[in-house]
UniProtKB/Swiss-Prot annotation:
UniProt keyword terms in alphabetical order: Activator, Germination, Nucleus, Transcription, Transcription regulation
Induction entry: Up-regulation by glucose of the Cvi-1 allele, but not of the Columbia and Landsberg erecta alleles. May be up-regulated by the transcript elongation factor TFIIS. Up-regulated by cold. Up-regulated by histone monoubiquitination through HUB1. Down-regulated by the histone demethylases LDL1 and LDL2.
Organism: Arabidopsis thaliana
Protein name (database record): Protein DELAY OF GERMINATION 1
InterPro entries xref list: Seed_Dev/Stress_Resp_Reg, TGA_domain
Amino acid sequence: MGSSSKNIEQAQDSYLEWMSLQSQRIPELKQLLAQRRSHGDEDNDNKLRKLTGKIIGDFKNYAAKRADLAHRCSSNYYAPTWNSPLENALIWMGGCRPSSFFRLVYALCGSQTEIRVTQFLRNIDGYESSGGGGGASLSDLSAEQLAKINVLHVKIIDEEEKMTKKVSSLQEDAADIPIATVAYEMENVGEPNVVVDQALDKQEEAMARLLVEADNLRVDTLAKILGILSPVQGADFLLAGKKLHLSMHEWGTMRDRRRRDCMVDTEVIFDACTTVNSGPRPTETTNNERN
């Protein structure tokens, strides 16, 4: 029990370090993007490439830590206690779906294109927008870039489906021999059993391998997308991804806190109503008593 608790604590500490590092990278990305859009020189492009390389390195290091810890507590990554219920409802194989990276690219491309059109229409009336420039946002994706992204998107979805089938098979194994038969034959529900422990150990080992495979797919997908995008587009994409990840964690935590507060308030009201209803009732006065 002590070893298991320590493993979970290490996994949570690793996650908190990862979230902290993402927060630190946001101002770095913002600063370099602002410099690139103001000056537009090759030196700033090189700085952006260097920073995006560091961020990919961050992701690889975090995946390596998870791979090491997952062999000791893999099931904790599939429904992490350090996540909010909202995050766990959206989780896939211990993290985000790699295909969601493409949805983010498309969303940013659409929203930034809309902004550019609005600015263009304002410029017709003499409005001058600041910053920008060729290749300065995801709205500047070329036809060649979009084609490459679409091809990669289809390939990654296929990889996701293969992995989803694997985890589905593992989930079904819980209702198969020997776990199901041992549970049925037990006199007392849930009592320790060596055969079950061995079967569950094998299942956790398989889940750990799948987690590593999923993390590798996430890292590989991110690196390939950045390879298609320009330095500015890649940095913009990473900035949006980090802000989305951190925001979802905060939004999920706030929603969970509101639900808990609401439940507490409801219990207080219920207790108050119960107390009032169970109290002594006033006696009715008869006509004789009034006389």
